[in-house]
Amino acid sequence: LVCFGDSITAQDWPDYLTLRCAREGFNNVSIIRRAVSGTRILREYSCITYAAYGLKGATRFPIEMNVAGARSVIVQHGINDIIHPVGVEVNKFRPWSDMPTADDLINGVRSLYVTHARKLSLKIYSGTLLPIYGWRTYNENRDIIRMAFNEWLRTAPEFDGCVDFDKAVRGHDDPKRFANNFDSGDHLHPSAKAYEAMAESVPEELLK
């Protein structure tokens, strides 16, 4: 089972998923992480300042899905496409023209990830994007894009299923925010407790 994404996947939920597999006796699955912090679906940076953010998803995905024995992939990707653009007057490398619509993200995932996963005979599961309320570039428009994209991720027939990470970590009274004790403090990345909840939200069918 390949876990594909950005900094959220580069951190702890795949580790907690591995621990869960050991604890619950899912002994016929390996959890493989393929994650790069800062990476986006649709674009990559051409400047050395953000070189560590790596390649865009269109380039990464075909390379990183070459995993011997892989049967399924969970894709949790796209939040950086939404939160990075701030305008050239703030950061010359992050123009507003980089801001995607929800349809841009949907078409990107459909054409770049779903299509290639099918070529490799992989089952592909969507992972919803987590709350961002309070993040330093948060605004209502960004959250509207996130929520519209999430709704598609939950319902799109192109996927074999959805891992609703957003539902696992969001607040019950205010779903735009992390639940209590689930925010690492920057309002973007989850706490250790939240990463554990994300791992617990992965359906058993992916682990058998």
Model-derived segments and their meaning:
Residues 32-34, 127, 165:
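Short glycine/serine/threonine-enriched helix-capping/active-site loop
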Residues 76-81, 112-147:
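Active-site segments of SGNH/GDSL-like serine hydrolases
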Residues 1-108, 135-138, 189:
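Conserved SGNH/GDSL esterase-like catalytic core that processes O-acyl groups on lipids
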Residues 129-208:
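Catalytic His-Asp segment of secreted/periplasmic serine-dependent ester chemistry enzymes
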Residues 9, 18, 22-23, 66, ...:
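Sec-exported extracytoplasmic/periplasmic mature domains
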Residues 30, 121-123, 161:
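Proline-centered loop/turn at the N-terminus of a beta-strand
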Residues 15, 19, 59, 63, ...:
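Solvent-exposed, polar/charged alpha-helical surfaces in well-ordered, non-transmembrane soluble domains
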Residues 61-64, 68-71, 109-116, 160-168:
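Phosphate-binding glycine-rich loops and adjacent basic patches that engage nucleotide phosphates
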